[in-house]
Amino acid sequence: MELSDSDRPVSFGSTSSSASSRDSHGSFGSRMTLVSNSHMGLFNQDKEVGAIKLELIPARPFSSSELQRDNPATGQQNADEGSERPPRAQWRVDSNGAPKTIADSATSPKLLYVDRVVQEILETERTYVQDLKSIVEDYLDCIRDQTKLPLGTEERSALFGNIQDIYHFNSELLQDLENCENDPVAIAECFVSKSEEFHIYTQYCTNYPRSVAVLTECMRNKILAKFFRERQETLKHSLPLGSYLLKPVQRILKYHLLLHEIENHLDKDTEGYDVVLDAIDTMQRVAWHINDMKRKHEHAVRLQEIQSLLTNWKGPDLTSYGELVLEGTFRIQRAKNERTLFLFDKLLLITKKRDDTFTYKAHILCGNLMLVEVIPKEPLSFSVFHYKNPKLQHTVQAKSQQDKRLWVLHLKRLILENHAAKIPAKAKQAILEMDAIHHPGFCYSPEGGTKALFGSKEGSAPYRLRRKSEPSSRSHKVLKTSETAQDIQKVSREEGSPQLSSARPSPAQRNSQPSSSTMISVLRAGGALRNIWTDHQIRQALFPSRRSPQENEDDEDDYQMFVPSFSSSDLNSTRLCEDSTSSRPCSWHMGQMESTETSSSGHRIVRRASSAGESNTCPPEIGTSDRTRELQNSPKTEGQEEMTPFGSSIELTIDDIDHVYDNISYEDLKLMVAKREEAESTPSKSARDSVRPKSTPELAFTKRQAGHSKGSLYAQTDGTLSGGEASSQSTHELQAVEENIYDTIGLPDPPSLGFKCSSLKRAKRSTFLGLEADFVCCDSLRPFVSQDSLQLSEDEAPYHQATPDHGYLSLLYDSPSGNLSMPHKPVSDKLSEEVDEIWNDLENYIKKNEDKARDRLLAAFPVSKDDVPDRLHAESTPELSRDVGRSVSTLSLPESQALLTPVKSRAGRASRANCPFEEDLISKEGSFMSLNRLSLASEMPLMDNPYDLANSGLSQTDPENPDLGMEATDKTKSRVFMMARQYSQKIKKANQLLKVKSLELEQPPASQHQKSMHKDLAAILEEKKQGGPAIGARIAEYSQLYDQIVFRESPLKIQKDGWASPQESSLLRSVSPSQVHHGSGDWLLHSTYSNGELADFCLPPEQDLRSRYPTFEINTKSTPRQLSAACSVPSLQTSDPLPGSVQRCSVVVSQPNKENWCQDHLYNSLGRKGISAKSQPYHRSQSSSSVLINKSMDSINYPSDVGKQQLLSLHRSSRCESHQDLLPDIADSHQQGTEKLSDLTLQDSQKVVVVNRNLPLNAQIATQNYFSNFKETDGDEDDYVEIKSEEDESELELSHNRRRKSDSKFVDADFSDNVCSGNTLHSLNSPRTPKKPVNSKLGLSPYLTPYNDSDKLNDYLWRGPSPNQQNIVQSLREKFQCLSSSSFA
């Protein structure tokens, strides 16, 4: 006879489930009582915290004879008598290993308790095996015998699984346990020896949900339900079959708990104690594995259910996106109804629940997913969006902080796991473990995945959590950062989970390499350490380049992305840096604060930190000195242990977690600065590109093309970049049309070509410092660059008295807040002085700048230099200009054609006499700093390999100041600050776009007739939106909107003869940073503003123009084909070109894409050989408000080679005239050609703008010219934009066609006259002949004039759409659609 359920001992540690308590009897039985320990002679000494008390015994103690099932009568009789079971001679092992009986150890309650635990294991195992036998023999075999039951073989297999295998295995295990004679060490050895065989439980547990489903179906069948009820009554089971089928699942998850009880009460000195620990590890791993497999199975079932309920989904089967990780219902901003989010391994699916179905709304692949964790004033919200479309953000409001943290943690894990870059597993683990420190409930386990700890023994979790199991007996320790790394590493080794704990790890964890432990210790040991995901700025620094899959990068370089950039000398054994040839900015921000001294710049560099990230701009000398101090200040360790990089002894406890979601604080800034100072590259490290932070919450994805073997200083990068930042990293995968996120102007990473110091030229530079210097020095950017960012405070020293050695870097970091602090001021003082300003609301920042009248000008408003305030010149000192001259040639040479916007260096105007030059070929009179770029470029032969080119550029870096050393790099600051300044520039740009108001206050009486000034559409709409959404939303909306609306072109400017004076070195300002650039179409292509305006070209006086032309408007009747890739103003980056894209010619037309004749010729004129790349139409609307000619080639029909020859002639003549301007002795020889060339036109009203020498116009005439883009009205119709009818242009076609023939006749002859008289170019008639002109370095003409007399007022009118051009109505509709779609709020 079988034991009834009430007669078997059940462990208090066993888990009950709803299935096992469905009947009236609980899992303990209806007659069970809990016997106190005191009844067993046990007192308080064993009542330790956390111990599982196993003193559950039957209400009637039964004798051992009851277990003799072969004598049921005797067993029943003994049970009725209630006789006590005689104690067996139980052999114990004392601390000395000598066996003693239980009688001898009666005085040892500890041993008695261990003995009770051993008895518990044996008794419950017997009962468990008995239950298994009942399932197999009394249910499974009986069903097999009953052929009439409507239960097929498949259903039977699903119902019982591999229960027979488990029964046989546990029968053997029970036999082995009984042979151990109650020796706890021997019992533990049994589990270790059979560890491999426990895998059969995985199959059973995975099948269990299906078993429950089959059983449920069976109970709906009357025949089967009756059969199961009868079997239960026959067997006198108090529990139904379902409860018995659950027992294997419960049992396998309980073994490690029982073994824990042995370990907790076994003497640590006992021989074989380690075996018990191994047994615990073994059974824990089994339990984890089973839980994970069971969870995956449950999620697969749920996934299929979701798939069946999902409507409107056009994508592939959801199973292709991996396992379901989380699901939940949230409120979404701007959505009336709640949304149900499903997070898969590779996909975030956003749906709307309707009745029982889910309607698809949106999805984002985890590889493209961006997460904004901190949203101001919304502590429960977070945002997710596609990195290519940051304006379409899904702001999700969680129901609790716990819910938010759960989602955020899993999102971050999946972002890391799905990132295109090769992120080492240890780096991922370190990042997630770092997060786990701040979230006690979550851990990252080596098995890969964030685990949720909810304390339940089965790893159960709330429903929405797709749980991953982890042992629950984990407790935190306080970790002091003053501990040596050895202690930290020992702590790390003793962890069973990523959390700091006192428990032992699994063998796999104990065997983890030191690099993992040291990295973990480094990550953990920061007192002021914060959540690396605190807000999106910090998170951005974590993500390296998104690489094209075909690129093969060095693993060590990838590894650098995610590890703190310690010197390899510090990590010689742990190998955090596999190779010291590359250093990446630290992915998280912490570092040793130097209490003794600071090596940061003496300026007050407090900037609006729009994004996080360090700039490894210090030379190796500084990094070495910092590391030397670090070694001196840090506790010394022995052997292979890593030096702890933290000198403070701040404690990190779980209490520090409470505010991890706050915004980055003052301490974080200090840590970032210190980290940047510490994380310097060694001299051999190449200036590879680095993680680019963003001012928008997006990642900068870089495609790095340079290899370690090249030691290349060149990195071709293009694509998404931060708004207002003058540096960009992206990949060719971002060439899609949708890449116009905020700015798609890409800038190459800077080779250190202009560094005058050998140490600096070796330093890794992660920001575009060269262009940064131009930023500081520019005045043409003044309308859209923050005054606080660019101007030196007038109440302080007018100059920056920097030596030539550090002038360059001090230039880069001149204080954006207009203050220069003294070099001796500590970092903390400088930071604290304006840390509030850094984090002030954007509104206050913008209001502060609104008062400046000049700020209301649009970014590319054409004003001659006569109108520039004089104080700009006073601020530019000889040393400043000298440093700029050194820095202007630090720009990299992009490989493909790209358009770089120019930077007009206001410092260059201060004194041309002080401009340093890298070539002696430039005459004294023509010496302008910007020629450094040209001279550097034209001296270098154009190499097919951009890396060789960069290397040759490196070889040209002048070692004349080799001792720049520490002082120079003391001027460097964290890239956080540089990003802040650029963010302020983006804000300023948006300010202009939003705040363009009537300029009549700045108009003298002569222009009173222009009272009704016209604004662009962005400004018009903004005035209607005043008081609308937050400035951040307006910035997001208008930064792109401004560029996507295509206006009629603004007039060009013509410079006067006196341009060469020190106060007016316009040549400098008209040179683009990419003048060296070997892939672009022409030297003249770069002479444009960032929004496409010709850089230095002023219109002649209005009277002169009116006498010559009825109108001087440039007609661009065709709008660009695509407005989707608009470039915003202040980014100053080269656009990511479509393959071989045709760049916009500011002076001529878009270069033909049929052949590469144009660029070949252009390189020939510079003495270089061209790159034979087929040009493709460049459909991007590059700052459309001032695009001269941006037609794709299909709208430019070259009827014959004559048209091409005209273009060639124009290029040559323009260059010739520019040379004549540069050389006074031939300054007058080009006059004759100007008049003729001005008549040259091309098909489709594509006007060739040619050189002319006229006086610049002042601000008022420039204003009139600019606003003549819009039809003047005499009322208050500022919002009115006229659309001309198609008939208005019909007459113009005839006149243009008539002019075409006569234009082409004299162009070449006139050009040859210019060439001969100028003596500057040699035999350029053949576009393929690579002749090097004498003054090729000087070939730059800042003078353009509008086209000729024959272009009448009618040219200003809109033309009817040609067959391959869009209708103007469609064009306007696109603009307004773009307007409405870009609205964030």
UniProtKB/Swiss-Prot annotation:
Annotated GO CC locations: cytosol; nucleoplasm
Compositionally biased region (Basic and acidic residues): 868-885
Region feature Disordered, mapped onto this chain: 1-31, 63-101, 455-518, 570-646, 677-696, 701-732, 868-887, 1318-1343
Flavoprotein in keyword set: no
Domain of life: Eukaryota
Record-level GO BP terms: regulation of small GTPase mediated signal transduction
Residues annotated as domain PH: 317-416
CDD domains: PH_PLEKHG1_G2_G3, RhoGEF
Cystine bridges: none
Residue numbers of Phosphoserine PTMs: 1192
Single GO MF annotation: small GTPase binding
Gene3D superfamilies membership: Dbl homology (DH) domain, Pleckstrin-homology domain (PH domain)/Phosphotyrosine-binding domain (PTB)
Name of the protein described by the UniProt record: Pleckstrin homology domain-containing family G member 1
